[in-house]
């Protein structure tokens, strides 16, 4: 879910808190709402790409130079100023909703400020989280950047004109990283180079960025069409292609020779402390890397036992590793011939669970939903992902599936669990319902905590049987494989970054414990190398939601209603897990 990751890093805690106080708004609440209103507006100006992704078009012409010294200073001052402002409020005098807002803001602002001591700007992008890739999605004409009016087209011209300056700053920061020993592993850099080179074409018409011209609205005047076509051709030729060439050449000729052969964050100066911070940030807990690691080992052992049971159920003779190999390679598990067949299979999963969805969820989102094949230019390095729709419902939520070769798309990879996670009722339900709920403060509509958002999506994978899925033992095995995948992450992410586990050792550990190809395991391990601790939030959040569900089922007995539980989990938007747990406990107490 990379787009969501982008929004998390960019918009983070951008917050507004206009809300109705059912018990009567106090002066303190009114002032607090005004403060967070100001915070929201100033935050969007700092994060114009985030504004675009949530459907706010006011800043569609801006591309911040977010690695520059000036931008970083402005961003740090912004966070400190609003943290200082929070001290002017007595939390006890706020209403319940504003207490959640206060706790959210305080937690995130403190984390943001702490993060400035680690020079993340020295690693401006990698093979997965990269503005050069996001720019491609935005500029294709089919992404979050709108291309419906002449102004829309002009906004994009202004925005992408700043790409060259952004790239110069990124190169400068990469060089500072080299000087300070903060560099990416070579194995990641070699993946980044062809990504840049793929954008270099001989004719502007062959460029991904020519897409908006191919999609020019029919109601544009002839003069506007001619002018925009000329301007887009010129920009592609003079700005976009040279910028990608500049980035590719730098990575190839200067950065790659200086990139490190180690895999983990601890190999860099101050890397161990930096990683411990990232663990706390991504899990929204006070857990140490070692605690996360031990949880991972325990979960791997538990899930492995369940996998053995299914292996025995289907009568497979051999150990689990042989069973994994059988599922990965037997042609009967690869029945598709075309990408359309793969996409249709996912839609079939959707249709089969609709009756039970209505029993388990009292509310369904209004935001449209689509299943699409991932664009070719990024498919090789992409995972299946969800791109959120716009809050007004004009842009659908999209479940993207990378299909490099449909004939090799394996049904035992966990298609059902993947759909539950990335699409329905996972990310599409959680994000869309939250965005659509205009009674929520804006920070809850558009805010993001990795452990909550990804934890919810992983929890949804555990609902398969209740939703009428996982009837086939191989699909159930695929679901267990997906759960195992998230448990393995707790082990290898921490081991890579704190225990000197090599890239190759991590790939082997993953392949030994789940049915994944070497290509797939390599992409996953390199993801953890490039985005440390991000993958830890999934299992951490899912275990918390499941823990609370089990507790309330036991405490409430017949009074526990699963649809009401899911409504409460989702209704207040993304929260740090500690704040979320307190809120849920208060809800459960009212059910007794």
Where are these predicted regions, by residue range?
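Sec-dependent N-terminal signal peptides
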Residues: 4-12
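N-terminal maturation segment of proteins
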Residues: 17-592
